[in-house]
Each structure stands twice: as structure tokens, then as C-alpha cells.
């Protein structure tokens, strides 16, 4: 009987150590293991495939654009109302204003804004200005947003206008949140002089 209890306690300890994702407060798996939809760490397709609702360190992590992806993440909304403030990061008291407030208007207004504290990706200053492709898992509505702030909900805190754009069935507004998948994507901010020259010669 004592051996059974010891084995049971050992198995329970191992299981608890492997919990991750929203079931464990946004915790990531050790050793870059994937976090399954059920909140357990592993390395097979059952854990790592977005088709199986992998939560973090998923196989299509998109590391090439510097951040990764996560599934089934909580997204709330925040009243930045950036268009009412001239897309001014200082007026919105956004965390990233320290580094990005002097970016051109075209850069600041290119995408809707979000605060970021998701389970996968850099946080703090290194996340500022990066872009996410965000998909509402309930409706399939999709948009690209720019990170301008930090949050504490373990996911995203979208500008209310972006939230409305994704909340096409209105259920998110009723609940106060939507469930989303996000992936870091290239913002397309790079200036390519060759492209600009080619574009102007085509116009002329």
C-alpha cells in the first residue's frame, strides 16, 4: 500500500510540473516543449500542431519574424481610441511611447493597437512595435495589430476598435473577451530604396 502511495505522489508531481498555458496561468513548457490545448507539455503533433490547438511553442512558430505563435489566448479590450488622439502614443500613455512615440504618423497609424502579455514572444521593450496576426477562434475574423503597450491578463489587450473588428458575432463584447490565436508577422515597415525608385519610375 505504501509503495502505491509513493508512486501516485511521484506521478502527480511529474504531471503538475508539466502543466502549461492557460491552465497554468500562462506558464511555458521547459526545454522549448509544446503546450497542448489541454495544458500539458510534449513534443508530438498532439502537443505541437496548431490543428490540435497547440497553445505555445507550436511547430509553425514563425520564428523567422522574431516571436512565435500561440493558440487559444484570452484577448480583452482597452479604450485607447487611437484615432481620437491622432495616433499619439504619449496621449494614450502607452508603455512603448518611450521608444516609439516619435515614429512617423504612417507607422503609428498603419495597424490597430494592442497591449501584449501573451504566453509566447518577447515582453517589455523588445516587443514594442512588433506586429501580430490575430484570429478570433470563434468566428475566423482576422486582423493585424501593432504592439504598443504591456498588459497583465496573460494574452492581448486590444484597442476597442480592433476588438470590435474581430468580434463579428458580438459574443466577445457580452463576455468581455474573445479567444484568439496570434502569430508574430512582418509589419512591412522596412524601407526599400530600390522598390521606391522602381515604383516612382513606373508612375512617371
From Swiss-Prot:
It comes from the Eukaryota. Laticifer. GO terms for biological process: defense response to bacterium; defense response to fungus. Disulfide bonds join 20-35, 29-41, 34-48, 54-58, 96-128, 117-151, 131-187. The keyword Lipid biosynthesis does not apply. CDD domains: ChtBD1_GH19_hevein, DPBB_barwin-like. Residues 1-17 form the signal peptide. Proteolytically processed to yield the two chains of the mature protein. Keywords: Allergen, Chitin-binding, Disulfide bond, Signal. GO terms for molecular function: chitin binding; RNA nuclease activity. Residues 61-66 form a propeptide. Pfam families: Barwin (PF00967), Chitin_bind_1 (PF00187). Residues 68-189 form the Barwin domain. Residues 18-60 form the Chitin-binding type-1 domain. PANTHER family: HEVEIN-LIKE PREPROPROTEIN, WOUND-INDUCED PROTEIN WIN2. N-acetyl-D-glucosamine / N-acetyl-D-neuraminic acid binding lectin. Can inhibit fungal growth. This is Pro-hevein. It comes from Hevea brasiliensis. The gene is HEV1.
